[in-house]
């Protein structure tokens, strides 16, 4: 949005939120994004839903492409690997929607909205595939 609308204030805010999430939102072991952190940066829920992982991938793409953040490339690779290792496994055509801090699935259903998030992330990754 910030680039399309030529809105530097939005770009600055997005950059601050991105940096906050990098500092406080990630599980160092899995490379996945925690469900919730407080405004002070403390982990409130260390479970991990699938859809925020896809949103994180899209944020890394935006940082790489629009903010010139070359370090976002390695974050993107870690995020993709974490997504496949912890969420895109199990029965063919299925996924692990919500996992605990040990990486165990505890959510039994497969929300259809997850397909939207996966497709959006894949679309962004495909769009920049020539950048990689």
Q: Where do the language-model regions lie?
A:
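Glycan-recognition and catalytic cores of secretory/periplasmic carbohydrate-active enzymes
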Residues: 1-132
């Amino acid at each position: 949005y910030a680039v399309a609308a030529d809105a530097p204030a939005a770009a600055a805010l997005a950059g601050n939120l991105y940096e906050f999430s990098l500092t406080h939102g990630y599980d160092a072991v899995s490379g996945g994004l925690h469900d919730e952190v407080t405004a002070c940066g403390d982990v409130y829920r260390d479970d991990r839903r699938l859809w925020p992982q896809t949103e994180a991938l899209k944020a890394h793409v935006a940082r790489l492409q629009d903010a010139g953040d070359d370090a976002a490339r390695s974050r993107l690779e870690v995020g993709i690997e974490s997504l496949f290792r912890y969420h895109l496994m199990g029965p063919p055509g299925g996924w692990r929607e919500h996992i605990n801090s040990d990486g165990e699935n505890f959510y039994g259903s497969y929300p259809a909205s997850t397909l939207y998030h996966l497709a959006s992330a894949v679309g962004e990754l495909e769009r920049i595939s020539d950048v990689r």
